[in-house]
């Protein structure tokens, strides 16, 4: 036994302990103590003397974790409501599941005799008998590995108890460890930040947090970000370089191989041949011949015994019954399934077998019935719902096999989902099937002399076994009659099966070893098989051992998970005896981690008759069937061996023997010898099938009669797998016969024993190293196997992000796990995997118990889990992303090169034949001298003139939500109302000319009258948006700030708003005592002013325009009378506005072009403006479009928020609007007033949607203005349509414009921002050198125009930065012209189109605001580009905003869905930003819809959002800090 690696050495017990034990036995026998009390006391007595058995790998994990001290790492914040996840099922005894489809083979026993945890409250009663698995504490017992497999000396009971209490303390109170640093010791720890909870004071009872530099931080969020930054600053292990190449086209670097990586050095391996297959002369010649022989000569011999969930035998099928029932079924299939007098089935047709795991008898009848009828059985799993995990792929299998008939039992059919007609439902992706119930009463007895003509030899297909690949596709492996016979003969020879032996089978009898041994080979040898159903194993994991005893079974067929669970349940079972077993076949012996289950099982059961040589691991695959199996010595097997391999070597595909003291080693056992009659070789995993060297890991290939022959109906993939020709290094084929690839990775060891280290399906290639999913699962389970992960259910897979595999680990957490437990466990898993595998985990997700998709026998359906992860339907309850650690192939951060001087740039452009990027609108010179221009120099004069010449001409119509006109103003009415306001200002307000007056009005005619009233008395108006009555707390301070910053001497408003400004509610938000004079203009007396003020010069200030930029800066610009009239003149010319025109305006009238269109243009041009307040659309979305239709407006203006509201709100109502008579064919131009890059997707959606209402396709365009000039571009009624170009987004990040074709990768569409207005000149200047740039070069847009603002009145926030905005000069070229800098990046491009003047048209493309751009990794990003990608990532993302905080990218997404689905978004957001922008997201914040603040123009207020985030005011659903 010593060679098995984990001996249980008996320590001699002192006399007093023996005496106490004897007393205990007596008390128990006399009934003075319960069994439970006895076991507790006995365990306490023996605890010091029983050596701790712990598998090497668990120890390695503990040792690795012991090296990490607890360190601070920000814990994700979660809203309380998002914490509640009810598990589907309460906690039941351990399941047989784990990551792989072979359910749970990876679960390791851990420490088997530690009984200390039995007194722990909270461990379920059924667990009291169970030996607790390894702990994650770094107590003395878990840190040492034991060379040679000998256990360490047992620590004293007091030490062990101290270790336990320390463990409990650490688990419950310590901070989650830092995952990104090396093994640096940090002695202090701090309690992690718990999730933020609504309604509970945050930070209560906490110490004041400090940053790394000791600076106190008063924000919970800031402290977490600081922790994250500190974590990221620390050196990582191994050092992670940023690999790159300079070539712009191929930004991402393939990771360079490590020059010190191990390389294979051995000789080239030779093909290994198994012993010859000896076919006995006296045995049956085929499987059906055997069935007929035993069925007729030994009819009473038992063939198969089925058990129920209580472990009682429900049915024993004899060979006679099997033969007669199979014949009956064959006869029915061939003769009684007729449609239109033709047989429904022909020889060779495929038939699905749908039988539950609890009914082996009917399955066996069906299988042999099909073989007798020359039909091909295709066993599949019973579908539980219409949309089972992988159902579509099973449908693909059935379709590719041409299956039209399914056999099942009565009971099974009753349990299948039904359609409303009562028929069996159609399952997702399945072809139409006929269902045949094969219970006895449904079958027809054949005539006495009837016998099928079945030919069961040769290359014809016998049956098809399904196989699910890594990607989830299900294919059918064809097994021919000759392969089937050879497999039975090889297994008989290798396992030494003899007639009438008993075999206990725990495996699925429908496929794999369970089918080959328990259904096929058993019949060949007239064996008796006891089948243990899965449901019984769940209830009683010891049932198979009990059946081995009661039936004196000679062989048993199990998986390592079965051994593991029976170990946990074996206490108190005294009468178990396994001496009858000569072979215990471990079907998943190829799983590298099965060795620990085998060793632990032997340790416990050797004293109960189990001989070490009985344990026989084997290796198999669906394609090659059985590849190798260990034989007992009496069958000629060599002694078993194990190999301790360096994990690092394995990751490079190289075998390096190591010692067990090392942490990162993999101990594997042999899976025995090659099968009789087979040849085996190992070939390279990638590329051509070259033979491996003797110290190299490769894919095992088999040549044998006994393998599968093809993937049914799939010739393409068949050739690669079943017809491989291995070649030597010189390219010479090693054999004239093809080999079959097994999908197993391994090597041939000493004594020609086969060793398997993993499966190709579980291989993840990260960088240049390979990692096995099973290995990662095993490490994660060893962290705290029994404590945290629900039933050991862990899935590991890789996803491709940024051209490399990234490891994702998903685990089901116990229903009672707390947030802190979860985070603690995740942190430790990351450390353990980093230590042992030297690889980072990209994403670690925890889901509630019982929510991962299940494979047929309770394991996890990996491909379905991966699919859900990528689709965002996994619904985790905790997520930890570590992109900073894992993503090492980002492009090199941009190094700014010394800039070329402005003069050289001009010369360069001249040499290249490029013109300087300069453009202008129509000339205004010839208009300057005209009477009208002089007459219309002051708007107050224009209004008086109109009131005198056309007094009754209507200028304004205001609509309410119902579409009715609530107020109008003719020229004379507006003039008179303005006079009244002027009189009130002079008499009541006692204001002088030049005083500033704040106008706080809702959108309407009152605001316009107040504006002209101010002009009439020489005051300077400042329009201010009124506070929102329901949201005074945030809106009133802005009003107050503008009033104060603009130095307003008086506030004009309506009665209602005046009351609001002085109310108690207002007093809570601002100091109401410091308001200047507030005048209410609702009931002012009808008075005239003695004389209307006339400004002494056109350059005198006319009004102030205040606006808050998207970066949160409040800026007021000064508009002179000259600039005001120039603006109106320019718009009049561009839009061809005359008194006979009507235009519709749906804009906020408080600043920029919106204010000019609402208040100024109608008075100047005389056209009628239909005013639609945007707020009214909240109660009637169709108001604006109905107004446009009703008044037949040729020109209309709106904001993006209005357009979005119409697109979202009226999407399904276009038909209804058409019925109401809404017709938009009158519209020539519909302009979106904006200060940003045109939102093409929104304008296109709007155009497409309302095309049905007659909206011309060319009508929609955008305007462009900014603080220095509110109207630079505006499409107007003439000139070419706006053009769209496509630019390379990657070049844009480098401040370059690279034009590409539509649809090319990384292309970004940019639409021209309307036409440059008359009198406006635009040039593109370099942002730093201020030199002029060439055509199609990206730079800052500079503007010169008579309607430029004359300067900032004040900039609240960043005064110093803006001094030169209005008086910039070029550093080279035309250095005389005074320009205003817009602060926007863009470029000019001369198009092939012609203007009205006949000149070629210059298009201006706005890329984005310079203030908003994010400088990350030396590149310039525009937030909108990242946000567009994020919104596309998942249908539940309603809106998104990004900003930076100390070099971390923060992404805020609004969730339009269920709160419990919020965490799905974290990984998708991180993935998409990495893939499309090469950026690592630092923090993902998930919030409710409407949290991202948006201004009246529909622009996101990212800086307000940032302030709210840092002040912890967003009430997020979840905040994920990416490591």
From Swiss-Prot:
| UniProt tissue specificity | Detected in heart, liver, spleen, lung, kidney and brain with highest levels in brain (at protein level). In adult cortex, preferentially expressed in excitatory neurons. Broadly expressed in neuronal, reproductive and vascular tissues as well as in heart, kidney, liver and lung with expression detected in neurons, mesenchyme, endothelium, smooth muscle cells and cardiomyocytes. Expressed in ectoderm-derived tissues in the developing embryo. Expressed in the developing nervous system.
Checking Pfam families in the record gives: AMP-binding, AMP-dom_DIP2-like, DMAP_binding
State the membrane topology. Peripheral membrane protein
Compositionally biased intervals (Low complexity): 134-158
What is one GO cellular-component annotation here? Answer: cell surface
Q: Does the keyword Mitochondrion apply?
A: yes
Motif PXXP motif: which ranges? Answer: 235-238, 259-262
Phenotype reported upon loss of the gene: Defects in dendritic spine morphogenesis along with thin postsynaptic density and reduced synaptic transmission of pyramidal neurons. Reduced postsynaptic density protein levels of Grin1/Nmdar1, Grin2a/NR2A, Grin2b/NR2B and Gria1/GluR1. Significantly reduced acetylation of Cttn. Autism-like behaviors including excessive repetitive self-grooming, reduced vocalization time and impaired social interaction.
Positions of the UniProt region annotated as Disordered: 72-110, 132-158
Q: What is its main location?
A: membrane
Q: Top-level EC class, please? A: ligase
What EC number(s) has UniProt assigned to this enzyme?
6.2.1.1
Any GO BP annotation = acetyl-CoA biosynthetic process
Please list the reactions this protein catalyses: acetate + ATP + CoA = acetyl-CoA + AMP + diphosphate
Limits of the DMAP1-binding domain: 9-105
Q: Where in the cell is it found?
A: Cell membrane; Mitochondrion; Cell projection, Dendritic spine
Molecular function (GO) terms for this protein are: acetate-CoA ligase activity
Phosphothreonine PTM sites in chain numbering: 92, 115
Q: How does it assemble?
A: Interacts with FSTL1; DIP2A may act as a cell surface receptor for FSTL1. Interacts (via N-terminus) with CTTN (via SH3 domain); the interaction promotes acetylation of CTTN and is required for proper synaptic transmission. Interacts with SHANK3.
Its annotated function is as follows: Catalyzes the de novo synthesis of acetyl-CoA in vitro. Promotes acetylation of CTTN, possibly by providing the acetyl donor, ensuring correct dendritic spine morphology and synaptic transmission. Binds to follistatin-related protein FSTL1 and may act as a cell surface receptor for FSTL1, contributing to AKT activation and subsequent FSTL1-induced survival and function of endothelial cells and cardiac myocytes.
The family classification in the record reads: Belongs to the DIP2 family.
Protein name per its UniProtKB record: Disco-interacting protein 2 homolog A
Originating species: Mus musculus
Taxonomic lineage from the root: Eukaryota, Metazoa, Chordata, Craniata, Vertebrata
- What is the gene called? Dip2a
């Amino acid at each position: 036994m010593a060679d098995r690696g984990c001996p249980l050495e008996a320590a001699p017990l002192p006399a007093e302990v023996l005496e106490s034990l004897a007393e205990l036995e007596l008390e128990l026998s006399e009934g003075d103590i319960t069994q439970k009390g006895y076991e507790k006391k006995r365990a306490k007595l023996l605890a010091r003397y029983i050596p701790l058995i712990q598998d090497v790998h668990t120890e390695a994990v503990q040792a690795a974790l012991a090296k990490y001290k607890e360190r601070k790492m920000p814990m994700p914040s979660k809203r309380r409501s998002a914490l509640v996840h009810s598990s589907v099922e309460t906690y039941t005894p351990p399941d047989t599941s784990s990551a792989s489809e072979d359910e749970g083979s990876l679960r390791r026993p851990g420490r088997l005799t530690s009984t200390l945890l039995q007194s722990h409250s909270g461990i379920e009663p059924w667990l009291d008998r169970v030996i607790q698995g390894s702990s994650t504490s770094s107590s003395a017992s878990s840190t040492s590995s034991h060379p040679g497999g000998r256990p360490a000396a047992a620590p004293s009971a007091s030490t062990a108890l101290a270790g336990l209490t320390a463990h409990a303390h650490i688990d419950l109170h310590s901070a989650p460890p830092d995952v990104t640093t090396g093994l640096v010791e940090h002695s202090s720890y701090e309690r992690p930040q718990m999730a933020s909870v609504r309604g509970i004071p945050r930070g209560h009872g906490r110490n004041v947090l400090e940053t790394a530099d000791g600076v106190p931080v008063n924000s919970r969020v800031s402290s977490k970000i600081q922790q994250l930054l500190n974590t990221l600053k620390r050196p990582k292990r191994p050092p992670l370089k940023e690999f790159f190449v300079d070539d712009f086209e191929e930004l991402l670097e393939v990771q360079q191989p490590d020059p010190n990586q191990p390389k294979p050095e051995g000789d080239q391996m030779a093909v290994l041949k198994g012993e010859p297959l000896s076919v006995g002369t006296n045995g049956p010649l085929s499987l059906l011949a055997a069935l007929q022989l035993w069925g007729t000569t030994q009819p009473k011999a038992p063939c198969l015994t089925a058990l129920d969930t209580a472990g009682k035998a429900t049915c024993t099928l004899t060979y006679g019954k099997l033969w007669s029932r199979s014949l009956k079924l064959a006869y029915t299939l061939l003769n009684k399934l007729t449609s239109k007098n033709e047989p429904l089935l022909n020889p060779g047709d495929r038939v699905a077998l749908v039988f539950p795991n609890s009914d082996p008898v009917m399955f066996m009848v069906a299988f042999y019935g099909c073989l007798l009828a020359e039909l091909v059985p295709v066993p599949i799993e019973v579908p539980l719902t219409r949309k089972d995990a992988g159902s579509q792929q099973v449908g693909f299998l059935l379709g590719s096999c041409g299956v039209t008939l399914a056999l099942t039992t009565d009971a099974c059919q009753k349990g299948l989902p039904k359609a409303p007609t009562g028929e069996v439902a159609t399952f997702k992706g399945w072809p139409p099937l006929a269902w045949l119930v094969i219970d006895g009463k449904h079958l027809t007895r054949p005539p006495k002399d009837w016998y099928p003509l079945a030919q069961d030899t040769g290359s014809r297909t016998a049956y098809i076994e399904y196989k699910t690949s890594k990607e989830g596709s299900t294919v059918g492996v064809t097994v021919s009659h000759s392969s089937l016979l050879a497999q039975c003969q090889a297994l008989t020879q290798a396992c030494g099966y003899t007639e009438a032996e008993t075999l206990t089978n725990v495996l699925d009898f429908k496929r794999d070893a369970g089918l080959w041994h328990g259904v096929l080979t058993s019949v060949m040898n007239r064996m008796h098989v006891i089948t243990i159903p899965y449901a019984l194993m769940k209830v009683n994991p010891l049932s198979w051992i009990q059946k081995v005893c009661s039936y004196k079974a000679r062989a048993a067929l199990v998986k390592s998970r079965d051994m593991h669970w029976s170990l946990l349940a074996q206490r108190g079972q005294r009468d178990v005896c396994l001496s009858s077993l000569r072979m215990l076949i471990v079907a998943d012996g190829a799983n590298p981690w099965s060795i620990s289950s085998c060793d632990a099982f032997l340790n416990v059961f050797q004293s109960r008759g189990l001989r070490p040589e009985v344990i026989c691991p084997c290796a198999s695959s669906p394609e090659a069937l059985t590849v190798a199996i260990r034989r007992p010595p009496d069958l000629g097997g060599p002694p078993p061996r194990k190999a301790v391999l360096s994990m690092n070597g394995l990751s490079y595909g190289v075998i390096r023997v190591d010692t067990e003291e090392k942490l990162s080693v993999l101990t594997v056992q042999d899976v025995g010898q090659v099968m009789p009659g087979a040849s085996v070789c190992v070939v390279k995993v990638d590329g051509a099938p070259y033979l491996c060297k003797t110290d190299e890991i490769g894919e095992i290939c088999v040549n044998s009669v006994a393998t599968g022959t093809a993937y049914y109906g799939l010739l393409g993939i068949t050739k690669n797998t079943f017809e491989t020709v291995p070649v030597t290094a010189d390219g010479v084929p090693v054999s004239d016969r093809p080999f079959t690839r097994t999908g197993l990775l391994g090597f041939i060891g000493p004594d020609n024993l086969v060793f398997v280290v993993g499966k190709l399906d579980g291989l993840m290639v990260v960088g240049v190293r390979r990692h096995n999913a099973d290995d990662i699962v095993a490490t994660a389970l060893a962290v705290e196997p029994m404590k945290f992960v629900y039933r050991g259910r862990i899935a590991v897979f890789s996803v491709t992000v940024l051209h490399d595999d990234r490891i994702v680990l998903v685990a089901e957490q116990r229903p009672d796990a707390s947030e802190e437990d979860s985070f603690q466990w995740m942190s430790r898993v990351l450390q353990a995997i980093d230590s042992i595998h030297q690889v980072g985990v990209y994403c670690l997700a925890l889901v509630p118990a019982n929510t991962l998709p299940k494979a047929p026998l309770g394991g996890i359906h990996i491909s379905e889990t991966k699919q859900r992860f990528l689709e965002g339907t996994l619904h985790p309850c905790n997520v930890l992303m570590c992109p900073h650690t894992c993503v090492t192939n980002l492009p090199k951060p941009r190094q700014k090169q010394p800039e070329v001087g402005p003069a050289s740039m001009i010369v360069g452009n001249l040499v290249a034949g490029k013109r300087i990027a300069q453009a202008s609108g129509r000339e205004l010179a010839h208009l300057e001298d005209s009477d009208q221009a002089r007459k219309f120099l002051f708007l107050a004069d224009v209004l008086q003139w109109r009131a005198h010449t056309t007094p009754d001409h209507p200028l304004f119509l205001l609509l309410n939500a119902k579409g009715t006109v609530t107020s109008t103003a003719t020229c004379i009415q507006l003039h008179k109302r303005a006079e009244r306001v002027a009189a009130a200002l002079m008499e009541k307000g006692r204001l002088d000319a030049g005083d500033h007056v704040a106008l706080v009005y809702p959108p309407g005619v009152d605001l316009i009258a107040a504006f002209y009233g101010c002009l009439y008395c020489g005051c300077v108006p400042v329009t201010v948006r009124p506070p929102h009555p329901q949201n005074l707390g945030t809106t009133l301070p802005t009003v107050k700030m503008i009033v104060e910053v603009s130095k307003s001497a008086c506030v004009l408003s309506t009665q209602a708003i005046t009351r609001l400004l002085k109310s108690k509610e207002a007093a809570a938000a601002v100091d109401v005592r410091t308001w200047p004079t507030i005048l209410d203009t609702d009931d002012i007396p009808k008075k005239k002013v003695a004389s209307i003020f006339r400004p002494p010069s056109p350059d005198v200030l006319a009004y102030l325009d205040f606006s808050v930029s998207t970066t949160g800066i409040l800026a007021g610009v000064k508009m002179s009378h000259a600039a005001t009239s120039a603006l109106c003149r320019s718009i009049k010319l561009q839009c061809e506005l005359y008194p006979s025109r009507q235009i519709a305006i749906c804009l906020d009238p408080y600043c920029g072009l919106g204010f000019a269109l609402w208040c100024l243009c109608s008075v100047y041009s005389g056209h009628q403006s239909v005013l639609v307040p945007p707020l009214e659309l909240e109660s009637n979305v169709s108001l604006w479009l109905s107004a446009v239709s009703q008044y037949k407006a040729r020109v209309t203006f709106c904001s993006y928020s209005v357009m979005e509201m119409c697109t979202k709100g009226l999407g399904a109502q276009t038909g209804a609007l058409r019925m109401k008579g809404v017709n938009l064919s009158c519209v020539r131009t519909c302009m979106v007033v904006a200060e940003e890059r045109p939102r093409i997707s929104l304008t296109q959606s709007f155009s497409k949607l309302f095309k049905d209402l007659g909206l011309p396709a060319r009508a929609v365009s955008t305007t462009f203005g900014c603080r220095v000039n509110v109207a630079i571009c505006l499409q107007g009624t003439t000139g070419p349509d706006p053009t769209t170009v496509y630019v390379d987004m990657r070049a844009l990040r480098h401040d370059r414009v690279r034009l590409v074709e539509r649809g090319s990768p990384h292309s970004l569409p940019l639409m021209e921002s309307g036409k440059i207005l008359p009198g406006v000149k635009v040039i593109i200047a370099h942002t730093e050198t201020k030199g002029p740039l060439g055509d199609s070069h990206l730079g800052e847009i500079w503007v010169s125009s008579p309607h430029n603002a004359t300067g900032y009145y004040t900039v609240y926030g960043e005064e110093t930065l803006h001094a030169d905005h209005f008086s910039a000069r070029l550093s080279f070229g035309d250095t005389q012209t005074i320009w205003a800098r817009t602060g926007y990046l863009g470029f000019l491009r001369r198009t092939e189109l012609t203007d009205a003047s006949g000149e070629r048209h210059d298009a201006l493309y706005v890329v984005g605001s310079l203030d908003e751009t994010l400088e990350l990794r030396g590149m310039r990003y525009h937030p909108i580009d990242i946000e567009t990608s994020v919104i596309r990532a998942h249908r539940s993302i309603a809106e998104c905003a990004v900003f930076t905080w100390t070099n971390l990218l923060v992404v805020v997404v609004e969730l339009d869905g269920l709160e419990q689905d919020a965490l799905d978004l974290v990984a998708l957001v991180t993935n998409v930003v990495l893939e499309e922008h090469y950026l690592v997201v630092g923090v993902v914040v998930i919030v409710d819809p409407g949290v991202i603040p948006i201004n009246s123009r529909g622009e996101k207020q990212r800086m307000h959002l940032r302030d709210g985030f840092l002040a912890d005011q967003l009430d997020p659903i979840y905040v994920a800090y990416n490591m």
